[in-house]
Amino acid sequence: MKLTSHEEYGLRCLIRVAQQGPGGKLTIPEISSAEGISDAYAGKLMRMLRLSGFVVATRGTGGYALARPANEIVLSEVMALLGGRLFEGDFCATHPGQLKACVRLPDCSARVLWRAVQAAVDDVLKRTTLQDLLFDEQQMMVHLKHLRESAAPARWQ
């Protein structure tokens, strides 16, 4: 499993805008230069983020700003826009190989594992905001430790 470039760069662009603080703006060239991507790709990602209500654009040389405070932007919403889930519940039924149905469909330990992994990822993303991603690495580790310690075991099943 790995993140797509849309997920990685889209999130990085959104973090970059959030780093400007309330009301702060960045233009496409500023975003693309800071993130090492083309203007066209930054523009495509920012358009997606704008159409989904994460950022607002000011025409001309105004640039992009957050549409709402960073502490109100939940990562599960952002990641759903940029790429979706790592493991979809119907994966086994839709990927049987050359057979009509996966031979392990009735009893599959791997499916249980992937569902638990997805539940853990979902839990972290639902309880993490864009504001949390403005932490430095050490602060983020503390945040994640807190999430892990406060997670109910049933959440990850």
Segment roles from a protein language model:
Residues 94-157:
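C-terminal regulatory/oligomerization modules of transcriptional regulators
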Residues 70-96, 110-120:
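Conserved segment of winged-helix/HTH DNA-binding domains
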Residues 26-36:
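A short alpha-helical element within helix-turn-helix/winged-helix DNA-binding domains
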Residues 52-67:
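Beta-hairpin "wing" of winged helix-turn-helix
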Residues 46-47:
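Short, hydrophobic-biased segments on the C-terminal half of alpha helices
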Residues 33, 50-51:
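Alpha-helical residues within the helix-turn-helix
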Residues 10-22:
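Short amphipathic alpha-helical interface segments
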